[in-house]
Amino acid sequence: MSWWSEVPLLLATTGIFLLPGLLVALLGGVRGYPLLALAPALTVSLVSVGSIVAPMVGLGWIAGSVLVTVLACAAAFAASWWTRRSVTRRDQPRDWKYTAALAAAVAVAVVLIGRRLLWVFGEPDSFSQTFDNVFHLNAIRYILETGAASTFEVGRMAGNDYYPAAWHDMVALVAELGSAGIPVAVNAVNLFAGAVIWPLGCIYLVQQLFGRKSALVLLAGVLSAAFGSFPLLMLDHGVLNPNVLAIALLPVALGAAVNALGLAAEVSYPPLVRWLLLVAVSPGMTLAHPSTTMALLAVLIPAAFALAFRKSLKPADGRSPVHKVWPWLGVAAYIGVVAYLWTVARPVEAASTWVPIQSTGQAIGEAVTGTALGRPVTWAVFILTAFGLAFLLSQRGTRWIASMYLVLTGFYVVVSSFPQDDLRMYLTGVWYNDSPRLAALIPVMAVPVAAYGGWKLLDWASRLPAVAAGLARIRNKAAGPAYVAVVLVGAVALVGVSAYLTQKANIRQAAESAKRSYEVTPDASLISNDELELLERLDDEVPEDALIAGNPWTGSSLAYALADRQTLQLHILATYGDDVDTIYNRLRDAPADPEVCQAVESTGVDYVLDFGTKEVHGIDHGFVGLRDLEETGAGRVVDQVGEAKLYEITACR
């Protein structure tokens, strides 16, 4: 299987992510680059919310998504009509140079990130050999088989009432509409999220923060591909597939929030449209992973202060001086709401057991240099970030932007270096106290800060006498061939040099580490070559209605996702009853123990996958009852590849 054969699926994935959102945004009056940047976020919201609404109105989950899309289109059109003026013409690029810069920035980012991700994935049907992937892959199969795609239904697969399912919904939609296998659909969605949604959002955020500057968006495109901590880290650690989608959507949501607050460099939307856009993009990100929405709320605290400060400086115009107090009361109320949510929108403490990994000094160094988790320094990125931060802090009107960056780096410093006390639990327990999750958030603001630093340096260089004189001569040539040639050469040089200086060991090491997680080898941590070959034979050897037992820690539960055969436990940490416990611990004793056969009859188990004792985390959790079934007379070997065995239970017939 090659990626060339999957081009139709990749095109289908692009259409699935873009078309519904484009339709809603168009009817809402959005045009220009924001239309493209906002479309995927809108689509994810439509699909994930539609999956929740569908069972409430008696529809299938895909039909529910269509219904929500139709309703959103109607609402968008109504909002656009109500404002009674076009909000889009001002969003059109001002000249051909900026249009070309946007196109080049997106194209360069897609190529730089896309080629890394394709190399990491290897084959289109590869899958991450990590703990969390057992749940993620099986959840997609669960949606496809049951139609239960709601965030309040998917978790039931593992005994939970709630699990954010937006990522799973999008993969299931791609698998269903694109007629693709689950691993291929997973890789297609992650590729689109990392190589398309993420850079689109980064460029959009830079546009909202700093305005329309060609060099700035070019730098933003290149820099979106310059951090090993996203998207590569989230495809390596966990694997945290939902976080990949959620964090990829965060720059768009942050840009929409800045616009809604009226803090954007060029506010061209009426307030109603601005706030509706923010409301529309937020559900998808939240239902992908709510911790990312918590990050958004925290990062917006400096923006709230900036807004209050600006409003308090406005002249009274005959009003009572009390009007200057209201903005600050609003800030206090906002902080109160965020503080409350911080205490309730989090996992239980028992699940937040990750420990600090370094000293505070080292954590600060990693945060500001973009070298989280010990990656090498990319000096160009560090220098641009340092200059950008210095420039932003030196200007009163942009200090709030620098503060947003410091919020995210501060979280990383806390989680990776602070003592395991109540303060650390309160601040970073939202992310399970897991350093990689917070390391992945830093690029959200590091990209615009570094891009701004690069643009300011270029602006400074352009003011040097010799350079300024040369630029003046070029401008005097108007739009002639020589002028166009110089502009193109300059743009190519900027992109080429910045790409060369940023695609260094930081990215390479992150990619190499992630690639190891996707390799099927004889000693792979989850599924070995032999085990995968045996899973591929199940279609011919196990009836469709059969139930298979196995130690989920060894990857046997992936028979559900990869072979479409029901397994006794669909998630490694799923809860199970006494009968299942009896099978796991005593099935081998079935010939002499009537209680075992009662458990077999009660659960309906027919087969056992024995993948040995090698577990994904290198620990032995027992499951001794599933071993040596043929030797004890409890079962017979139906098939075997290497040490991987498929048993049929025969003792209880």
Where in the sequence are the language-model features?
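Active-site lumenal/periplasmic loops and adjacent helix-entry segments of GT-C-fold
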Residues: 106-248, 265, 513-525
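Membrane-embedded, hydrophobic transmembrane alpha-helices
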Residues: 1-96
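Hydrophobic, aromatic-rich transmembrane alpha-helices
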Residues: 305, 379-403
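Membrane-helix boundary/interfacial segments in multi-pass membrane proteins
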Residues: 57-62, 124-129, 179, 232-245, ...
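Membrane-interface alpha helices of multi-pass inner-membrane proteins
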Residues: 268, 272-290
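Perimembrane helix-loop-helix junctions
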Residues: 296-331
